[in-house]
Amino acid sequence: MHVLIAGAGLGGLTLAQNLRKRGISYEIFERDEHKDARFQGWAIALHTITDELVASMPSDMPDLRQATDHMSPLKIPTQICLYPAESNVRVGWEDCPETPFIRAERYRLRNHLATNIPIQWGKRVQRIEHDDQGVAVYFEDGTGAKGDILVGADGVKSVVRQQLLQKSHDEVLKIIPLAAIVGELKLSGEAFKRQLQLSHGSYSLIDSEKGYLTFCSLHDVAPDGKSARYYWIMSRSDPTIADPDHWLHKATQQEKLDHAREVMSNREPKFREIFDLTPVEGVKKETHIWRDLELSSLPAGRVVLMGDAAHVMTPFRGEGGYNTFIDAMALAKILDRLDKEDKTHDIESIKNSVNEYNAEMLERGVKSVQLSREWVDGSKVNSKKPLLAPMKVIPFSEVPLEVAA
């Protein structure tokens, strides 16, 4: 069996590692020209399936936590906290034996997953061909590849999905009624320490009355442990966000920052500080429009979808990456079975196996898409059940800025 993977993001690379461990032939193609071509995102929570994920990969991989933990080099456990507006109690999760998890910095995570993977860069999919005998993918640079299975791991605006379904992105992607302002900043000294006291990692400020859900998070810590990059996303439900005349599409960075500070004006100074310290140039100029994807079915054949190409969702429940990793591990098992049973050229066996994968993947993915969409409404977020585990009260404690050896 020879597997073609379009997309060297978290999902495509995880699948490649799973295939590498099983000795299954593969090629992986990425549209970016190199690994630093574009921003990879901030941080992602790895939880509940971390042990399974590590076990699914070859033994020559570096330690996942050491390679990706966004708290490194600080010797404190990461936390995910929530602060309801009507309460002074902090609830959430802390990395511990009862609720183990990693907040992985996404650039480090992608590099980790790329260990010993020969990524072919600058390969933007132009078109695909598939029939009962095999698959072929052709790229904008004039090259192409042929194989037995093509996996579309090429993200939200998947060309593989578009070609497989013969539907445009606008036909299948739903605009999320979510207006958001995003800011970034660097903190050091006492300001850094005060943020760590609010959470060793990330925290959400829930304002049920105003309908705002604001997520603040550490991105990564400097090598000396004395400063860190932070980011925040202030969002609320807004069905008019796609209107080109929406005020956010025309607002200056200063106007967006002023709005965020006004929304936070009734909160305690410790919660206002991260917004007060955000420089104007740290506010994102563009207004991001989130989209999600619910597919009721997919064709079963030699072209398979996974990750955001199959079930993109909002980031607020932390389930996008979780589902992508499950997709990769599940698909690897299906392909391994076909390979071992020598069914690579048996189209009926391939259809049955891909049907099995699609059914489970879509049911799980659609459920997460729907639950993630509900979190958009800040007035309802208090009633939502998280994936990781029941939230617990997290008491406050002093934060020693001790750096690991």
From Swiss-Prot:
Cofactor section: FAD
Superkingdom field: Eukaryota
Keyword entries, A-Z: FAD, Flavoprotein, Monooxygenase, Oxidoreductase
Keyword Flavoprotein recorded: yes
An example Gene Ontology molecular-function term: monooxygenase activity
SUPFAM superfamilies documented for this protein: FAD/NAD(P)-binding domain
Binding site for FAD: E30, A45, R106, D308, G321
A Pfam family annotated for this UniProt entry: FAD_binding_3
Entries under InterPro entries matching the protein: FAD-bd, FAD/NAD-bd_sf
EC number(s) reported in the record: 1.-.-.-
Residues of the signal peptide: none
Family statement drawn from the similarity comment of this UniProt entry: Belongs to the paxM FAD-dependent monooxygenase family.
Function: FAD-dependent monooxygenase; part of the gene cluster that produces the tetronate natural products trihazones. Transcription analysis of thnD confirmed this gene is expressed, hence its role in the biosynthetic pathway remains cryptic. The pathway begins with the formation of trihazone A by the hybrid PKS-NRPS synthetase thnA and the trans-enoyl reductase thnE. Trihazone A is further decarboxylated by the 2-oxoglutarate-dependent dioxygenase thnC to produce trihazone D. The function of the FAD-dependent monooxygenase thnD has still to be identified.
Name assigned to this protein: FAD-dependent monooxygenase thnD
Organism: Trichoderma harzianum
Lineage: Eukaryota, Fungi, Dikarya, Ascomycota, Pezizomycotina
Gene that specifies this protein: thnD
